[in-house]
């Protein structure tokens, strides 16, 4: 039987290669690329933010009107990222701004209206630009959560969308897109202040809830995160909504872009290395020495711990700080790179000054340095409060750096704990959100390093052999798409 080629429209608020603020952008670039490589037709739709509209290669291909909207005119610019066609929706009223979502840590007051417009315009433009009706419209997070709702309500009898199914990916359920009804009353469906699919009170709606209630299929970005979304803690208050859709909820672990994170080809790191023991040992030794020199740490062959993250409680800094000075009493070195909460940054700076022979803190996001940390460290610390998928643990394994993680979200799915399965181990993990539990697992890793370095090297090489390529994840998405189409 010939398997049908799917027509997929991937809708996201950001796409790496064009504009990025977080992991959503990575997925929005990598997944469509893999879907295309597997033979499917893929288009991306996103907003034409100021930096995108100003690009020389962003050609205007459509100027049109959005019916029943106060600011009716919009344009569509055509670009491509990694060979995938991109339709970027341009509206001076909504997207001609310095940033995507906020300025000076203050969300734009009209974000509800902006992304309601984006959702409505997406469904308006597709019949005007596509020759082939889409089989799947794949939307992401709250910014696009109204698209499944509008498909079910506004377009339920529209011939172009008659066979189209929607999929919603949840990258982080903390952000729900909560707005007053009046803020999105430009959509006629919301003028009545009664939309049960989206309502969270008599005055407010959640765009994410609308997507969860109306999408044909929902996926979380790891299997364990899908389970966590069924709980009040894991869903941040939306458990009943996810429980209503449990039969349509699936977890698919994000892939890794090995074109960027590959020690054999990495142009950032001081010495490239291959997936064999001799090359790995030599390469990591050279990268560690270069990292030490770069950060003015003593040139010593001691256990090197790395951490690259936003300085927020989500990333588990609150578990590390209480035990950090106790941990630094041991013969080791630690590098932390990141920006975020100034209070956390100040405390890390103080500790780094007190322990300058062991601990370097760099308050910045430096992509080159991030690669150096991944390559030069022996262990990588990720004690997250929650982590829907996580990527640094996957990058770490690719570089033979053993992740030390809390067993949440995708961290639990991707890291095999040494103390649970020595033979197949790829790192270390702990369960409870307690500083002392983190200290115990850190000391466990340090003990192994000091007593059995050969065993550490064996586990590091095994970690390097793990395969989290995007094509494997894309096959699972295709299976989900076909289930949605056939349901």
Curated annotation (Swiss-Prot):
GO biological process, one term: glycogen biosynthetic process
SUPFAM superfamilies tied to this protein: UDP-Glycosyltransferase/glycogen phosphorylase
The organism's place on the tree of life at top rank: Bacteria
EC main group: transferase
UniProt keyword list: Glycogen biosynthesis, Glycosyltransferase, Transferase
Binding site for ADP-alpha-D-glucose: 20
Annotated metabolic or biological route of this protein: Glycan biosynthesis; glycogen biosynthesis
Catalytic reaction equation(s): [(1->4)-alpha-D-glucosyl](n) + ADP-alpha-D-glucose = [(1->4)-alpha-D-glucosyl](n+1) + ADP + H(+)
One GO MF term attached to the UniProt entry: alpha-1,4-glucan glucosyltransferase (UDP-glucose donor) activity
Keyword Glycosyltransferase in record: yes
A Gene Ontology term for the protein's cellular component: cytosol
EC number: 2.4.1.21
PANTHER family named among the record's database cross-references: ALPHA AMYLASE DOMAIN-CONTAINING PROTEIN, GRANULE-BOUND STARCH SYNTHASE 1, CHLOROPLASTIC/AMYLOPLASTIC
Function: Synthesizes alpha-1,4-glucan chains using ADP-glucose.
Similarity comment: family membership: Belongs to the glycosyltransferase 1 family. Bacterial/plant glycogen synthase subfamily.
HAMAP family, sorted: Glycogen_synth
Name of the protein in its database record: Glycogen synthase
């Amino acid at each position: 039987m010939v398997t049908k080629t799917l027509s997929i429209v991937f809708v996201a608020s950001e796409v790496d290669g064009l504009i990025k603020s977080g992991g959503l952008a990575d997925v929005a670039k990598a997944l469509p690329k893999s879907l295309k490589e597997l033979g499917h037709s893929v288009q991306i739709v996103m907003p034409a933010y100021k930096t995108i509209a100003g690009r020389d290669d962003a050609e205007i291909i459509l100027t049109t009107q959005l019916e029943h909207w106060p600011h009716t005119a919009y344009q569509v610019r055509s670009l491509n990222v990694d060979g995938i066609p991109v339709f970027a929706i341009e509206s001076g009223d909504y997207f001609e701004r310095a940033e995507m979502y906020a300025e000076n840590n203050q969300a734009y007051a009209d974000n509800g209206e902006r992304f309601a417009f984006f959702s409505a315009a997406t469904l308006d433009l597709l019949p005007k630009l596509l020759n082939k009706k889409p089989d799947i419209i794949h939307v992401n997070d709250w910014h696009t959560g109204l698209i499944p709702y509008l498909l079910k309500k506004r377009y339920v009898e529209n011939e172009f969308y008659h066979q189209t199914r929607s999929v919603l990916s949840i990258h982080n359920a903390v952000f729900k897109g909560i707005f007053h009804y009046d803020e999105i009353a430009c959509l006629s469906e919301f003028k009545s202040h009664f939309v049960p699919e989206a309502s969270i009170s008599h005055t407010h709606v959640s765009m994410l809830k609308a997507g969860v209630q109306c999408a044909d299929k929902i996926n979380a970005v790891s299997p364990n995160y899908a389970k966590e979304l069924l709980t009040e803690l894991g869903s941040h208050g939306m458990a009943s909504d996810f429980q209503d859709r449990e039969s349509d909820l699936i977890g698919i672990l994000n892939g890794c872009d090995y074109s960027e994170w590959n020690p054999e080809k990495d142009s950032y790191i001081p010495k490239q290395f291959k997936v064999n023991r001799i090359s790995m040992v030599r390469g990591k030794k050279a990268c560690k020495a270069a990292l030490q020199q770069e950060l003015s740490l003593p040139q010593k062959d001691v256990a090197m711990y790395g951490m690259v993250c936003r300085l927020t409680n989500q990333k588990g800094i609150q578990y590390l700080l209480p035990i950090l000075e106790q941990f630094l009493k041991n013969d080791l070195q630690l590098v932390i790179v990141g920006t975020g909460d100034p209070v956390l940054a100040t405390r890390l700076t103080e500790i780094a000054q007190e322990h300058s022979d062991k601990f370097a803190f760099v308050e910045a996001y430096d992509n080159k340095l991030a690669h150096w940390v991944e390559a030069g460290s022996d262990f990588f610390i990720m004690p997250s409060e929650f982590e829907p998928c996580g990527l640094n643990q996957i990058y770490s394994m690719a570089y033979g750096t053993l992740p030390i993680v809390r067993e949440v979200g995708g961290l639990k799915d991707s890291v095999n704990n040494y103390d649970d399965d020595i033979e197949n181990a790829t790192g270390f993990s702990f369960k409870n959100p307690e500083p002392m539990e983190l200290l115990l697992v850190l000391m466990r890793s340090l003990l192994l390093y000091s007593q059995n370095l050969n065993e550490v090297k064996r586990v590091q090489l095994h970690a390097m052999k793990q395969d989290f390529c995007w094509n494997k994840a894309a096959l699972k998405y295709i299976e989900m798409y076909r289930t949605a189409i056939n349901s």
